[in-house]
Amino acid sequence: MNGKSMLIVAATVFVLAVVVVSSVAISAQDKYTLKLPGGVPFSDWKGYEDWRLISTSKTDDRLKVILGNPTIIAAFKSGIPGNGKPFPEGSKIAKVQWKPKKSTEAPFVVDVPDTLADLFFMEKDSKRFPETGGWGYAQFDYDPASATYTPDKAGTPTCGQVCHVKVKAKDYVFHPYQTR
């Protein structure tokens, strides 16, 4: 093989390597680029993974951890909503929901998180969401097989209002800030 042929082979291998690496990088989903059909972007909750714990809950099919951004945590600590005041603008809640499974390691019966099911979010922004008490709602479903998120099929910023209207007196928030 002469020098020119080796150069062509090397260039071809390099181009193929760049294509493969680029394809892998592109296939990794950036969840923060997602938006609900109503326009609420996942990026509104960027950093939710590091928010403080508000509470936990369990339904028959989900284990849930409710997290809050610094704005809502400060509001809870000041007595909201128990003092009759509404949560301030910019308050945000993230509910991380897993499918449960029985622990095979614990010496007692306990449900532990299995696969992530979905993420549910609330955001206080009275200008953007005046028709729902100032709160916007979003849910993104997680597909463990592809490790990707998709906007929930209900997909509108008002999808959570139907349930949360039951706690209007607590500014539409179900979970109290639990004692630590």
Predicted regions and their residues:
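Sec/Tat signal peptide C-region and signal peptidase I cleavage site
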Residues: 21-28
